Design a protein with these regions (language model features):
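N-terminal accessory alpha/beta regions
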Residues: 1-12, 16, 21
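Fold-level signature of zinc-dependent metallopeptidase catalytic domains
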Residues: 19-174
Length: 174
């Protein structure tokens, strides 16, 4: 572990102690590349302009129910310059952890009250597909459930760590 540990230590110490490296978690200063000047890992090798262009091309202005494009993904630029999303889902990025989330949601579904069973099923679908329309369906069911004795929040929800307001960190509470 000696060389690996020393290499890791060098990276960590640089990130912690170099005031020029990651000045702020979330830069919102006008006229600057907000992605390049913010300390997060939602965009790998991608500039603010490239990210904005990527999602602008994805959006369908005629869609009556547009989704929050990018909410559950990391945007990366490949060696050949191609920009793509790495979606957080079963079989995608963070799959082992998300598989555990699905496992426990399936357990909870077995003891949930009726309206909540459908809500949990929609959330499981979302984690399996990564499809943001499934996430919207889950959220609509969650909001409509006003009778279940136990409430919960679960998903890639908090977008305040992304300078572009697109990517969300995961949270769960019961």
């Amino acid at each position: 572990f000696g060389d690996e540990l020393n290499a890791l230590r060098a990276v960590v110490c640089e990130a912690i102690f170099n005031p020029e490296l990651y000045k702020t978690q979330l830069n919102q200063a006008e006229g600057q590349d907000l992605v390049a000047t913010s300390a997060n890992n939602y965009y790998e090798g991608v500039t603010q302009a490239e990210a904005e262009d990527f999602y602008r091309a994805m959006a369908d202005p005629a869609d009556p129910e547009p989704v929050s494009y990018g909410l559950n993904s990391k945007l990366v630029k490949d060696e050949d310059g191609t920009i793509r999303e790495r979606v957080w889902k079963v079989g995608g990025m963070y799959s082992p952890a998300i598989e555990k989330i699905v496992y426990w949601l399936e357990k909870a579904q077995g003891v949930a009250q009726e309206p909540q069973k459908a809500t949990i099923a929609a959330l499981i679908d979302y984690y399996k597909t990564g499809n943001l329309h499934d996430f919207d369906r889950y959220n609509i069911l969650w909001v409509r459930d006003t009778v279940s004795n136990v409430d919960f929040v679960n998903g890639f929800i908090e977008d305040y760590g992304d300078p572009l307001g697109r990517k969300a960190s995961w949270e769960s509470l019961v």
